[in-house]
Amino acid sequence: MATIHWSKRQVAGWLAVALSTAVASFWAFWGINENFHEGWFHESLLLNVGLMFLQYLSPMIIFLSLALLAIGFPRIGGMAHALAGISLAWVLFDWEDRVAMQLVILPMLGLGALYWYGRPQPRRRARWIAVGLPMLTLVAAGVEPAVRVAGRVHDNNLDARVVDGNGIRLVWAAEGMGWPHTGVTWHEAVRRCQHLSDDGRSLAETPQNVWRLPTVEEAVRSMSRHRINSGGVWDAQTSVARYQIRPDKEPPLWNVHSQVIYWWTATERNDDAAYMVVYDGKVWPRRKRIAPDYLAYRCVKPADAAR
């Protein structure tokens, strides 16, 4: 059996291809999962596809493009990697930030140097690997969330809803001040629920104390999928929620076409943090002062109060 002898330049070239492929595959996995987790909420298919490519798949596309350029034109591709690393560090970090130097600039300079010196042979095989593995990762990781999102039900009912099941019966506020489309801090969410009018349409100048934030247990027990209660149970000792059926971003609790995927709950972890619930049922502690657009709230009141 003939022994294959690789030159140093071949080893360097294939090492560069392997690193590029690994990074692109990681971004393919992350991007397609995040796309269907927090993205894909527009009513327009064009907007959903555009957001997917521009925001979630762009890191994979960048690394794929750089790898293909470097395989075909090693020195141009090597310089492109260096410029990309410097540009990303400049855009994403403070120029004097050591994290930027260690996690972005130096790795990209190193990868660029490997492509500059290396010569992966045969190039055609290198191209197929650099493109094929990330695309395979993209498809394999994207099938389940794509099918799940495509199968979501939506009844276009954004009014106040009585949700009864799993030992919990509550009225969940209608779209508006009691159920907004943008995020607020935990303290602001608590304040708004306290000031929300009885009909849930406006905020009063003084606390009405009709509405409130749901507790973690109430939110977990109310979760559903395809209008079937998910059988959620909240273990306060381990801070873990368990379900018989995995919940999803569907009515009566969630708005399919809203960017909001997390809700504040009334349950505090400590003075600085409170628990939030995700549409898929997970529960995480977050600092009360943060207010990203995708973290909002939905006020609740006892169902008996609606009579």
Question: Predicted segments — roles?
Answer:
Residues 194, 198-208, 216-276:
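An exposed tryptophan-centered "aromatic clamp" motif
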